[in-house]
C-alpha cells in the first residue's frame, strides 16, 4: 500500500524574545537580527528594544509582532489619525517624516547602487488630492464609509483623514450624512473625491439605478457644497449631474481630464517633479524630445514650452486624444501625440525618423523592459526615467548602463508620506 507524506511545516514557537531594532525598511517595518537572519517587526523603530513574538520563520528571514516595547526612539511620533493602526491607508504615521525619507532613500540607493542626493517632497499632511472611499450599508445598520482595513475587505468608518486635502477632509461628515439619507444606500459601491484646479469632484459608483428623489437630493447637495457631481452606474459609464469639466495645473499649463483619468495624487510633488525633469533633461530650444507613457501630457506639454518639438506616445487611446486637446487648449503647436503599442519598435515609426535628443519615460509598475532596447537605438543624450516601482527601475536601468549610459542623478520622490510607496526619478547620460 502506497503511503503519502507531506513536508513538515516550519513550526514557530510563541516564545518571547528581546531584540533591538537597527534599521527601518522602506515599508516602515523595524529590522533586527535574530539567529543570523533579518527579523521584520512592524511598529518598531531603530534604537528601540522590545519583547517580541515570532509569527513567521523562513529560511532567509523571520517576522514578529511586538509584545512589549521597552523604550521609545526620539524619531517616534504620535499618529495624527485616530484610525491609524486599523485603517490600511497609512503605515508610518508613528515615524518622523525625516526618518521615513531617509529609510526610503536608503532602500532606493541599495537597489540602484547609487547615492540619492535629491529628495523631492511636499507637506506631509493634507497632500492627497484624490481618494476612493468604500461604501456599505448592512441591513438595519448605519452606512459604512471609509477605507479598507489592512489586509482585509472590512471597512474602517473614517470620520477624519489628516492626509486628505483639507477641502476633501472637511467634506467627509457631510457626504456621509447625504449618502446615508438616500433610499438606495444598499446599492452604493464607493465614492471618489478629487480636488482639482477647477474645484472639488465627487464620483458616486452605484450598482442599481437611483430613484429620481435620490438623484435630486444628490444634485441639491452638489450645488450646496459647490462641487461637480458625476454618477457611475457601470464601470465604463459616467453621467454628469452638475459642474464643469475638471482640470489641473502642470508647470503653469492647464490640463483637462476626465474624472476617472489618472492624475498624480500629490500636487506639490508633481509640480516639483515636472520642474526637476525639465532641469535634468536640460531642454533647449533646438531639442527634439520623446515622452513615452505620456498619459494626457503631464510632462509632454511642459516639455513643449522649451523644446523645438515633442512627441508624446501613449498606449491608451482616450489619453492620447486628451493630450491633443490639451495641447490645443494651451496653444502648443510643436507637440504631437500618438497611440502606439509601446512593446513594439517605436524607432520604426515615421515620427521617429529624425531621432530624439532627449527621452523621458514614466511607465506603470511593470516598468519598461520591452522599451529599453528601442530607447537605446535612438541614442539620446539624456534620459529621465520616472518610476513608481524601484524593483523594475533597477532592472530596466541595467540595460541602459550596459549600453553605455551612466546614472548621474537619482531622486527619491516622497509622493505618499506615511506609506510604504517609494517613487523615484533617475537621470541617465550617454558617456
Curated annotation (Swiss-Prot):
Keyword vocabulary terms for this entry: 4Fe-4S, Iron, Iron-sulfur, Metal-binding, Methyltransferase, rRNA processing, S-adenosyl-L-methionine, Transferase
Active site residues per record: 388
Binding of S-adenosyl-L-methionine, residues: 264, 293, 298, 314, 341, 362
Enzyme kind, highest EC tier: transferase
Pfam families, per database record: TRAM, tRNA_U5-meth_tr
EC number(s) reported in the record: 2.1.1.190
Gene3D superfamilies according to UniProt: 2.40.50.1070, Nucleic acid-binding proteins (2.40.50.140), Vaccinia Virus protein VP39 (3.40.50.150)
Catalysed transformations (reactions): uridine(1939) in 23S rRNA + S-adenosyl-L-methionine = 5-methyluridine(1939) in 23S rRNA + S-adenosyl-L-homocysteine + H(+)
GO molecular function annotation: 4 iron, 4 sulfur cluster binding; iron ion binding; RNA binding; rRNA (uridine-C5-)-methyltransferase activity
GO biological process, one term: rRNA base methylation
Domain TRAM, residue spans: 10-68
Residue sites binding [4Fe-4S] cluster per the record: 81, 87, 90, 161
Highest rank taxon of the organism: Bacteria
Entry's family note: Belongs to the class I-like SAM-binding methyltransferase superfamily. RNA M5U methyltransferase family. RlmD subfamily.
Free-text function comment from the UniProt entry: Catalyzes the formation of 5-methyl-uridine at position 1939 (m5U1939) in 23S rRNA.
The protein's name in its UniProt record: 23S rRNA (uracil(1939)-C(5))-methyltransferase RlmD
Annotated source species: Salmonella choleraesuis (strain SC-B67)
Gene that encodes it: rlmD
